[in-house]
């Protein structure tokens, strides 16, 4: 028997377990890494500050709740750029519902000849059977902008082409023939519909979304060369060669 602490919003395993047993989900830490208001002596203090941990131990001891304390060395995640300490943090994200495509992907996998053969039901097959919904949005500057615009009331527009973007733009001149559809230029395009203004959400797509779109994007599908894809002339591929890491 034993006891282990859990922090629902600050670790994947913690979050999944919390969902299973119905633990409440709320944040005690803000995006800047400091504790939220209402956390007594922790309020506005940095969660990674060593003195904060010491003060928590002192508080537990003062209230007669401390069983034991011990220092031990362990690994801890840091930002590879600035070397700052980082924490896991549950946030809202945009997902693709891959779990709804699981059965179709498994059926498609049956028609593929794999070399080596064991990957079909092994490494790749197991990944397909356990496929998770894909959190594909990223909070980065560079990347394919998520084509979603949002109004203040939460209403959203998903734009499917430059032509549609131009037709909805408050200032159509921003979407000329030579406009740059990347950040920061696309962020300045305001859309108007039903008397409401829409601002683009700041997220970009995971670069693997771009990679997955390659078979279609190289032909400018669906705006051109539709027959190559729709009639199976250029998709799916007859042969694909990948490194082992591409089989997940």
Predicted segments with their positions:
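Alpha-helical recognition segments enriched in aromatics with Gly/Pro capping
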Residues: 24-31, 140-142, 148-151, 159-248
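Residue patterns forming the tRNA-binding/recognition surfaces of aminoacyl-tRNA synthetases
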Residues: 2-162, 179-181, 246-247
């Amino acid at each position: 028997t034993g006891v282990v602490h859990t922090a629902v919003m600050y670790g994947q395993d913690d979050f999944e377990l919390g969902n299973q047993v119905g633990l409440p989900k709320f944040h005690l830490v803000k995006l800047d890494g400091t504790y939220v208001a209402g956390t007594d002596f922790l309020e506005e203090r940095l969660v990674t500050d060593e003195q904060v941990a010491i003060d928590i131990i002192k508080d537990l001891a003062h209230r007669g709740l401390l069983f034991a304390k011990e220092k031990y060395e362990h690994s801890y995640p840091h930002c590879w750029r600035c070397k700052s300490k980082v924490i896991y943090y549950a946030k809202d994200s945009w997902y693709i519902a891959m779990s709804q495509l699981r059965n179709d992907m498994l059926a498609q996998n049956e028609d593929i000849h794999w070399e080596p053969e064991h990957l079909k039901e092994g490494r790749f097959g197991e990944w397909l059977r356990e496929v998770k919904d894909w959190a594909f949005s990223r909070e980065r500057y560079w990347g394919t902008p998520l084509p979603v615009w949002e109004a203040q009331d939460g209403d959203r527009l998903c734009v499917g082409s430059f032509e549609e973007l131009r037709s909805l733009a408050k200032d159509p001149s921003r979407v000329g023939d030579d406009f740059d559809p990347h950040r920061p230029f696309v962020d300045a395009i305001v859309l108007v519909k039903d008397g409401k203004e829409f601002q683009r959400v700041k997220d970009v797509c995971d670069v693997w979304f771009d990679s997955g779109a390659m078979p279609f994007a190289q032909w400018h599908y669906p705006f051109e060369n539709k027959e190559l894809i729709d009639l199976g002339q250029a998709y799916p591929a007859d042969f694909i060669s990948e490194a082992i890491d591409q089989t997940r």
